[in-house]
Amino acid sequence: MSRKSRAKPYSPFRYFNSPPEVIREVVMLYVRFPLSLRNVEDILLQRGFDFCHETVRLWWNRFGPMFASEIRRKRVSPMRNFSRWRWHLDEMYVKINGEMRYLWRAVDHEGEILESYVTKKRDKKAALAFMKKARKRHGPADAIITDGLRSYPAAMRDLGNIDRREMGRWLNNRAENSHLPFRRRERAMIRFRRMKTLQKFASVHANVSNHFNHERHLVDRQTFKERRSAALAEWQSLAC
């Protein structure tokens, strides 16, 4: 038998003493819920695991983007086949060291967070970069709903899809409401200190939120429980 055939398959957990299922649960708790690093540390202690809060920080930084990338890869392809795909675009301000920065988000008609993008300004250049990134990953949308920010039509003219723009009162509530879970999470983290950290966490948070979005308000209790169990089982199989 050759040395190559005897080699063990690569595991991202190989240099960690803790079980992979514990690491996955720690990342899920910290990213999904509005908990601080020390909150997660206390929850784990009640379950019999004595970890420092800095271990929680290390694990989410190391494995959060990896898990998010795998989730996104599984979800992007089916979404490209949607008929009458509608995007809702909106931007929210985030303070970093006292300076205003902007987090752009694209949400589809079913509440899926498609893209998160951080910029220093919200001008045409920023809007164009954001929309190009979203279109490159997800393909074109049949309709794009925005607010009255003039950067959107300016960027859409360059992209040649200004005819697909829709704007009106209450039309963009889906995008605006999608900011609320992130705002709660932001307060628990006591703000961000760097744009790079904000971009990283916003991307990971969006994909984890998508994975555990069971549309609870649209289905009965039994269907919700089945979807929740399936999502948890799939989460525990990430990076295997």
Task: Give a label for each model feature.
Residues M1-C240:
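Residue-level recognition of single "structural anchor" positions
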